[in-house]
């Protein structure tokens, strides 16, 4: 396999972004001769601002060997990181860290920056990125998502609706503002 495991950390995942990469991801995660996915795929994302799309996660979850974890509380966990770690048992892993979410706009037309570093060339940095991903993966803030589980679907759908501002009545905020002496 070109890669043994891919770990993806992005704030938002949209259907347009998944469609751009689906063929590559299907090839990478295809079942091999040993009846196992050739590449394990782990994804961490959020419901922050309601930008992640349910159907995008559903499509990814159908890939063999794909596991997804989602923070359902966009107000508490403001994950803004974007990183892709390609891990290889050979020790020739690589990572891409930048500004692009997994969306069509970011992948195709956005003005995004991405930096690549390698396990061999920048081993400390690569290990730090890998360890940070593992820490987030094990954090209970990021809940497993299985589209076949009705509770998971309901919780994710509700979190996305709330983050997008649907069905939530905005509470007015009142301030007692007083100008500073130099502002009068």
Task: Describe each PLM feature range.
Residues 184:
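Pre-Walker A adenine-sensing motif
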Residues 1-181:
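PLD/PLD-like phosphodiesterase catalytic module centered on the HKD motif
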